[in-house]
Amino acid sequence: MPNQPLENAHTFTLEVSNKMGVHARPAAMIVRIASHFSGEIWVTKKDGERVNAKSIMGIMMLAAARGSELTFECTPEDAPELEKQMSDLFASKFQDE
């Protein structure tokens, strides 16, 4: 359920730093990574909107511009590898620049 926090969830926050923000291609990259994990993964924008990280439409609906902070919430077993892969993706500025 989208409004229910995950039990024993691990969270981490990343900042969008590319000029164009999270448009279609970065959204697809986020979904591609999230889809490799079996557990639930949610993303929350600072304003409180929470979406499934495996949904490209959900990620795009966040309209995350440069400087937006996105908080990922996942199951503990997925946490170390998911955080590493997402951190690397965000650090690469989604290969936009």
Predicted regions mapped to residue ranges:
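A short alpha-helix capping/helix-coil boundary motif
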Residues: 8-11, 39
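Generic structural detector for well-ordered beta-strands
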Residues: 13-15, 73
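Broad gene-expression machinery/nucleic-acid interaction feature
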Residues: 11, 56, 69
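Compact, glycine-rich, soluble single-domain proteins
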Residues: 15-65
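C-terminal structural segments of small proteins and small subunits
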Residues: 63-97
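SAM-dependent methyltransferases
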Residues: 1-9
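Short, glycine- and charge-enriched coil/turn segments that flank and shape catalytic ligand pockets
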Residues: 8-9, 48, 77
